[in-house]
């Protein structure tokens, strides 16, 4: 397992420290490149690498040929034939802070003599994305694809030709008039997020191990010894560089190279630009950062390359990287820290969630001190204990989570987590149903923690939209026992609000105005605001549309609720239990008392027309050859069928297209008839 500077005491002997760093970095490289089982966060690796570089800079006599600083890193796996690259596949130096980019631009400008003029002449750079995948080289001879190899250690890689041949985005024959005799295309094999999710759905359906992330999935798929397995994996490719070129002149700029690649039929990413100077580089970086989470694939930074080929040649290379390029990496999304305690939080519905209390660590652009552990089963599965050194992940707006513990660093006094039997907030008992992963406090609205969360949910924009009722105000209202249920909100007055801490008179009046406005809502919003487990906005709208008014919903049996579009057994039972609880009915009556919350009510939705599928439940999954899912749904409903969202024993038919996933496996397990699109059409025509 991984060891870092934290597990090896600092020493005054640079030689000893350098030797340990080299061994640790090589071990991490082997785990990452050969085993495809990375166990050291990128940020930790970068920190160790920079420390070794610093030691070798101060003590040049300690540099040895096999130091990680003198090569790219990694070894060819024994299961594939080695391929020696005619031109090395080098890695890039990294920059992290804006200052690093300004310094890079200055170094380039100085070396090219552009900073000597007055005013300085800005350097043109090609800026593009840094994909989180696997680097490969494709060789084409007279336009025909003949070989593919991984980067390996930069000098020798692995022959993965047959596997790469299965990647549909990679042309087996180049097109266009300008096809060279020999061309080595450098690029990245990756897996799009949507394809990764579908792959894991298939893995789950087949009861096989799921992949941790798209990069691991891409790497594992590319290095399959059986290319038939690779062919079933949804891999993609983007070209971004060049190795050997024979039979024509090298394009004058990097941007022209990528334009030429597009002419040849090679996939080139469109998120690229030619920019000038450090200001242009940073503008591109921050622009990409704003839309990073919305991109359909994972990236871990951007890459800058001097655009002109002659200037690249003039700048040349250092031992392991080109001087004309730099990778500008986003803040690390994973980091190491110590787990000092595990507490539990109580959610709006009483869910008890273990929360890791951490030594502060900077990850994903923010300092993290808490991270979710999801539930008791996850803590057990990952074998996470108090006192462990853990890997923490934070990406974008996602809640930080503990990924795993480093078992080789576990202290002797590490303690296992014990789920409490009583709620830490109200003292009520904690229960966990046999078929659920979540334990829950049974205190209901008696529990202040649930009370606060329930009020916060009630006030959300998509619920009753009570502007100005934030968490701090709710905390005071609950802690001072001024509000116990949502109905109490409409009883508070100006004097009460004005006395709250840091709550000005204007704020008090604004909140009262917002409460008055919230009294006029819709049935769907009101249902959603109640915070019924498993009832989101869509289900609330379906309930309102189906029943037309609140009383029929409150009195509906589970069987009646199952007739609502997309309501399955679990949701129906949750709704039924909520309205069966007398306390909930009391709160609802208080809310719709005269002068309180009102909404327009109407008749229930008309019964589905009788047809050949009247009374039948059908589930759609996958992609149909000629029909969009909504079209198929409309056809089935027009024939009287209920189109459900999940497969159960009550499902009469499953209509399955391509990439059917777990619903198909569930249907086969339950013996539900499975139809393709043609079968569905025959069913609609009454031929089945």
Swiss-Prot record:
List GO molecular-function terms, semicolon-separated.
DNA binding; DNA ligase (NAD+) activity; metal ion binding
E.C. number, please?
6.5.1.2
Entry's Pfam families?
Answer: BRCT (PF00533), DNA_ligase_aden (PF01653), DNA_ligase_OB (PF03120), DNA_ligase_ZBD (PF03119), HHH_2 (PF12826), HHH_5 (PF14520), Nlig-Ia (PF22745)
Domain BRCT spans what residues?
A: 608-688
Q: What does it catalyze?
A: NAD(+) + (deoxyribonucleotide)n-3'-hydroxyl + 5'-phospho-(deoxyribonucleotide)m = (deoxyribonucleotide)n+m + AMP + beta-nicotinamide D-nucleotide
Q: Which CDD domains match?
A: BRCT_DNA_ligase_like (cd17748), LIGANc (cd00114)
Coiled-coil ranges per UniProt? none
- UniProt xrefs under SUPFAM superfamilies: BRCT domain, DNA ligase/mRNA capping enzyme, catalytic domain, Nucleic acid-binding proteins, RuvA domain 2-like
One GO BP annotation is:
DNA replication
Q: What's the top EC group for this one?
A: ligase
Q: Catalytic site residues? A: 130
The cysteines joined by S-S bonds are none
The protein's UniProt keywords, in alphabetical order, are: DNA damage, DNA repair, DNA replication, Ligase, Magnesium, Manganese, Metal-binding, NAD, Zinc
Q: Which GO terms describe its cellular component?
A: cytosol
Q: Where does NAD(+) bind?
A: 42-46, 91-92, 128, 151, 188, 305, 329
Role summary: DNA ligase that catalyzes the formation of phosphodiester linkages between 5'-phosphoryl and 3'-hydroxyl groups in double-stranded DNA using NAD as a coenzyme and as the energy source for the reaction. It is essential for DNA replication and repair of damaged DNA.
UniProt similarity note: Belongs to the NAD-dependent DNA ligase family. LigA subfamily.
Entry protein name: DNA ligase
> What is the name of the gene encoding this protein?
ligA
């Amino acid at each position: 397992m991984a060891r870092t500077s934290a597990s090896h005491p600092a020493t005054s002997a640079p030689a000893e420290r350098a030797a340990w760093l080299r061994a640790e970095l090589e071990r991490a490289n082997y785990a990452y490149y050969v085993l495809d089982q990375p166990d050291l966060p990128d940020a930790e690796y970068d920190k160790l690498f920079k420390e070794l570089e610093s030691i070798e800079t101060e003590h040049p006599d300690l540099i040895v040929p096999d130091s990680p600083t003198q090569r790219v890193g990694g070894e060819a796996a024994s299961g594939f034939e080695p391929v020696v690259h005619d031109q090395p596949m080098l890695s890039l130096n990294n920059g992290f802070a804006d200052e690093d980019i300004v310094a890079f631009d200055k170094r380039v400008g100085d070396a090219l003599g552009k900073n000597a003029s007055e005013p300085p002449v800005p350097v043109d750079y090609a800026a593009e994305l840094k994909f989180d995948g696997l680097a490969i080289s494709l060789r084409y001879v007279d336009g025909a694809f003949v070989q593919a190899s991984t980067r390996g250690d930069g000098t020798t890689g692995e022959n993965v030709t047959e596997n790469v041949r299965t990647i549909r985005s990679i042309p087996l024959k180049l097109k266009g008039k300008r096809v060279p005799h020999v061309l080595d295309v450098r690029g990245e094999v990756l897996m799009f997020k949507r394809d990764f999710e579908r792959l894991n759905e298939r893995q789950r359906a087949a009861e096989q191990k799921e992949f941790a992330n798209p990069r691991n999935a891409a790497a594992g798929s590319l290095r399959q010894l059986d290319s038939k397995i690779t062919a079933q994996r949804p891999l993609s490719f983007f070209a971004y560089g060049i190795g050997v070129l024979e039979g024509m002149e090298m394009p004058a700029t990097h941007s022209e190279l990528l334009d030429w690649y597009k002419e040849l039929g090679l996939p080139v990413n469109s998120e690229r630009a030619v920019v000038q100077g450090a200001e242009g580089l940073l503008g591109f970086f921050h622009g990409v950062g704003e839309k990073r989470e919305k991109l359909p694939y994972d990236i871990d930074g951007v890459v800058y390359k001097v655009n002109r080929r002659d200037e690249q040649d003039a700048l040349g290379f250092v031992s392991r990287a080109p001087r004309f390029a730099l990778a500008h990496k986003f803040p690390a999304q994973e980091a190491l820290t110590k787990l000092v305690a595990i507490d539990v939080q109580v959610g709006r519905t009483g869910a008890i969630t273990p929360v890791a209390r951490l030594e502060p660590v900077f990850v994903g652009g923010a300092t993290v001190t808490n991270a979710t552990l999801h539930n008791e089963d996850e803590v057990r599965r990952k074998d996470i204990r108090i006192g462990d050194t853990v890997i923490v992940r934070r990406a974008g707006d996602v809640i930080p989570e503990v990924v795993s513990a480093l078992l080789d660093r576990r202290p002797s006094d590490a303690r296992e987590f014990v789920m409490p039997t009583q709620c830490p907030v109200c003292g009520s008992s904690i229960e966990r149903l046999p078929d659920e992963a979540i334990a829950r406090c049974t205190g209901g609205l008696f529990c202040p923690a649930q009370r606060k969360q329930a009020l916060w949910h009630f006030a959300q924009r998509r619920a009753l939209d009570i502007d100005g009722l934030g968490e701090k105000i709710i905390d005071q209202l609950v802690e001072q026992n001024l509000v116990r249920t949502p109905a109490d909100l409409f009883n508070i007055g100006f004097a009460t609000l004005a006395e709250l801490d840091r709550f000005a008179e204007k704020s008090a009046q604004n909140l009262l105005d917002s409460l008055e406005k919230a009294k006029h809502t819709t049935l769907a919003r009101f249902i959603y605001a109640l915070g019924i487990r498993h009832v989101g906005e869509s289900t609330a709208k379906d309930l309102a549309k189906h029943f037309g008014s609140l009383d029929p919903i409150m009195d509906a049996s589970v069987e009646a609720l199952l007739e609502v579009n997309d309501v399955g057994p679990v949701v129906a039972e949750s709704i039924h239990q909520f309205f069966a609880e007398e306390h909930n009915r009391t709160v609802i009556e208080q809310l719709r008392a005269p002068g309180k919350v009102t909404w327009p009510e109407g008749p229930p939705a008309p019964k589905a027309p009788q047809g050949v599928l009247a009374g039948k439940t059908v589930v759609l999954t996958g992609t149909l050859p000629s029909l969009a899912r909504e079209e198929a749904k409309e056809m089935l409903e027009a024939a009287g069928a209920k189109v459900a969202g999940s497969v159960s024993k009550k499902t009469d038919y499953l209509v399955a297209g391509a990439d059917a996933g777990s619903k198909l496996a569930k249907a086969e397990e339950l013996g539900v008839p499975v139809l393709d699109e043609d079968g569905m059409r025959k069913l609609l025509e009454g031929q089945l």
